[in-house]
């Protein structure tokens, strides 16, 4: 048993740890949302991930993403896997350095219990989320997380299998830059929604 799982045993029952340890989470995008969602879920007992991102780590990512200066230039999915393995050596990550689109999304995440939308551009986020409507997967998305001191984050259940978090108003741009506090807040809400779904659905 790893040090992390030993410590989690103080807070979670063996049954809960087993349930979390069996779940596989797909994450589309390994940037500010995706990298932090993965880190938060790992620290909460998730051990299996599918990480999809074609980009490389840049210096401008370090203000809000779960990477170190020495990761700059590396593929995000692989760099994230390495960071996660430092916390939990037994983590299982399948990494894909590709762009997610309508032709490959379902196959990439086919065996996942939950799919997390963690893409950057509004158009890509909307298109990705629309792919899953009626497919039967549980999807957790985000919308509106730029700036600082702006409207509070919300969690909206948009049907039985779709949750979206954010302020639903503030896109990250020049006037409302993506800064760590609100990005992390959205990522934490996404991770919490994933945990709640896994633990509650498996108990019912």
Name each model-derived stretch.
Residues 75-112, 119-122:
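A structured beta-alpha segment of the ubiquitous adenosine-cofactor-binding alpha/beta core
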Residues 32-33, 46, 56, 122-123:
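Residue-level detector of alpha-helix initiation sites
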Residues 24, 47-49, 92, 138:
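Residues at the starts of beta-strands that form the adenosine-phosphate
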Residues 21-42, 50-53:
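Glycine-rich adenosine-cofactor-binding loop
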Residues 49-54, 165-167:
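Non-cysteine beta-strand/loop elements that form the S-adenosyl-L-methionine
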Residues 51-87:
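Glycine-rich phosphate-binding loop and adjoining beta1-alpha1-beta2 segment
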Residues 1-25:
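N-terminal charged helix/coil linker that caps or initiates catalytic domains
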């Amino acid at each position: 048993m790893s040090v992390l799982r030993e410590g989690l045993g103080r807070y979670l029952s063996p049954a809960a740890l087993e349930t979390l340890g069996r779940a596989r989470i797909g994450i589309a995008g390994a940037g500010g949302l995706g990298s932090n969602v993965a880190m938060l879920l790992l620290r909460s007992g998730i051990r299996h991930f599918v990480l999809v991102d074609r980009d490389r780590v840049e210096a401008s990512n370090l203000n809000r993403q779960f990477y170190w200066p020495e990761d700059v230039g590396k593929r995000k999915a692989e760099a994230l896997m390495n960071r996660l393995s430092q916390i939990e050596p037994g983590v299982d990550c399948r990494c894909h350095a590709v762009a997610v689109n309508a032709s490959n999304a379902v196959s990439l995440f086919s065996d996942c219990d939950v799919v997390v939308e963690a893409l950057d551009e509004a158009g890509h986020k909307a298109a990705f989320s629309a792919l899953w409507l009626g497919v039967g997967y549980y999807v957790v998305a985000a919308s509106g997380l730029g700036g600082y001191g702006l409207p509070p984050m919300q969690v909206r259940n948009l049907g039985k299998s779709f949750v979206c978090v954010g302020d639903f108003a503030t896109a990250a741009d020049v006037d409302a830059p993506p800064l760590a506090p609100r990005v992390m807040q959205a990522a934490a809400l996404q991770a919490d929604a994933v945990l709640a779904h896994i633990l509650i659905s498996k108990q019912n």
